[in-house]
Amino acid sequence: MAWNRKHLLRLCTLLVMAIGLSACSISYKFNGSSIDYTKVRTISFETFPNRSVGFVWGPMESMFNTALQDIYMQQTPLEQVKRDGDLQLSGEITNYDAYNKGVGADGYSTMAELRMTVRVTFTNKSNPQENFEAQQFSASREYDASQQLSAVQDELVNQMIKDIVDQIFNATVANW
């Protein structure tokens, strides 16, 4: 008899949980975007030129532009068009520079910091209150100053680009 009660109690518990959960509605988008796809179907990107006042590293411009377009193509069903998209992104890389971060007892730099800043203008034709102009997005990475920048530059720039692209995505379509 105890065995049947035990199973009956478990069955009742599962039934109550199933009814309770079916009454709940949880909505979560795994891509993080909050776009109304009935109004927004296309996106256009202008090339973000490298107008840095600091260093100029040739591959950075194309790396950034590719990463920016990729995040929207991978995380939204938006169609990329050459111009006049429902969403429009334009801007420029305004800063890319290295700075001494820490000095050792011998007076030489021990840590250096690489910084990158991008200025972005965003237009949402279906929801103009989300537009912004000349908003700055930045990222930085530290590295051991005993290393040559050329030895760590590719990895650090990729990390900074990922950070900045995520910031832009969140500011434009994720509404965090």
Residue map of PLM features:
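Sec-dependent bacterial lipoprotein signal peptides
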Residues: M1-C24
